[in-house]
Amino acid sequence: MATIHIIEDDWGVRDALIELVRGFGHRVAAYADGEAFMQAGTPLPDDVIFVDLGLPGVGGQHVIKWLKGLAQPPRVVAISGRSRGDIEAALRDLPNLPLLRKPLAAESITPYLEERGRPSRRCSP
């Protein structure tokens, strides 16, 4: 089973994403910064990584470039609440990277939770 990794420094956003992803029956690993994520070990190719571009310390762009440089990179999705200009500058060297703008909606996240071509289904509480 793939793991959904959430790298987000805002605890409220991180907690909401954890609950949403778990509600769809996925295994979740969450990190408050890029350093903690990178120290946790290399993600698997089937994993999905949601990365906030505005991380403190090791920034989201650095984490994404590291992930894209892996022999078998996982699916990566950038998230940001920054202005359009800031986002475009941050992603200039990262073409074709999916981006979700904050505030996040469940409908924008669920397509990235598909596993092996099967859509995620909401689990009953």
Label the predicted regions.
Residues 56:
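The feature encodes the CheY-like receiver
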Residues 86, 104-116, 121:
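C-terminal output helix
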Residues 33, 59-62:
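Acidic catalytic/metal-coordinating carboxylates
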Residues 61-72:
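Short amphipathic alpha-helix used as the core "switch/output" element in two-component signaling
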Residues 11-29, 94-97:
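Two-component/phosphorelay signaling modules centered on CheY-like receiver
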